[in-house]
């Protein structure tokens, strides 16, 4: 099945800014998050949205995608080699020019692979940060042979077939004459070493797989999809090389009352008709507790109030966002006869047409409810 266009997945224009891409991603991530959306295809859609965001939010990846689409020539090549339709061309190219490139020392120190760990956070955990411990499976240097793969007291021998280079020169006859093609040595598997007496602990691999507990300090203000690099906590390196890094990717659960956009928090409070018409002082929940908010007389539904400094702290420690409180007027469903009579009286005073409800509208309302 062919992949959908990333711009189509996020519903953004090809000239969309990073901020627009981020906003679209947050909206869709909340919609398809498996913890919220229980539909069968929600998880697949969530992953599709995440994949599109990872590409379009990175300037270099976006540039490659804009040029090549899903047929990026950088994909499909690397440590594992090319595959599929490129295989035939690769073989021909190797035949005339020699595969494998220049000589590399197979025993040179090599950095270990990076690891990725996905951590799910509650909404407020992402806002305020937390210290936690995770456990990950990873390869570590064998403590018995110290990475050599050989039994203690012995050492690996240099491969006699490739002379320690890890590569063999293979001569081939072609229509253009005899050519030399360089291949990985199949005797030492490219390591340049032969281990006759293997370490019993790691079976000659030089590495063992263990579960490692790592302390993680989640920074306050971390957002959905962001990642934290933990240096040196990836897979073990080879031949004395440094370990890779661990990247912790965060998924933040939605909140039942608050919504987040960057460092700002949004919420909606229901108010009665008399509250917005006459004015009131209400208590509004914030991330740090309740605060009082004055509702001016005549407030319209949809009006938004800003609570400065009540949002999310900047993940880099540069200030804090605001909280936006939007008013929603709730229409009463079960009125008493007395309340209905008051509303009829008010309707008669106001005229019932919006164009007639001028500056004296709320004065009439006050009189109706106060019995003046």
Swiss-Prot record:
CXXCXGXG motif repeat segments: 142-149, 159-166, 185-192, 199-206
Species annotation: Shouchella clausii (strain KSM-K16) (Alkalihalobacillus clausii)
Signal peptide residue numbers: none
Compartment annotation: Cytoplasm
The protein, known as: Chaperone protein DnaJ
Main location class: cytoplasm
Subunit structure: Homodimer.
Annotated positions binding Zn(2+) 1: 142, 145, 199, 202
